[in-house]
Amino acid sequence: MNSNKTKIFSFFLFTFVFASLVFTQPKAVIHPMEYDFGDIVQDSIVTKIFVIKNLGTEMLKIIEVKASCGCTAVVAGKNELMPNESTDIKVTFNSEGKSGKQNKTVYIETNDPKNSTIKFAFTGNVIKKDDFIKQIKEGSKK
């Protein structure tokens, strides 16, 4: 009889511990998931602030932030977020030497067990300064 009580107790203890581990974890959410800068004048620098929030019940750790190319700098405001806390992710794109449609991806590595690497993207159309000036002059004639 004691053996059955031990088995039942062990089962409930395992279930409780497992449920605690599953439901107590960080959960990272980023907003917006994508952004379009529209037209960007060549050789200019543009910036967008994305926001990452911890919707989980444990501390979210931002382990690393990086971009798909050296033309983009990414900086996290904080590296540790308590539950329901958020921070800015500043993304700066340098269009120097670029031309045409640009598609870039930013990666955030976290301790979120269900979403350890968050990917979000931005786009833009880099136009040459002369073409931009021409567009402005043509627009003012209308």
Regions found by a protein language model. Name each.
Residues H31-F37, T72-G77, I89-T92:
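Short structured motifs
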Residues M1-F12:
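Bacterial N-terminal signal peptides that target proteins for export
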Residues K48-N54, V91, K104-E109:
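Buried hydrophobic-core signal for structured, non-transmembrane domains
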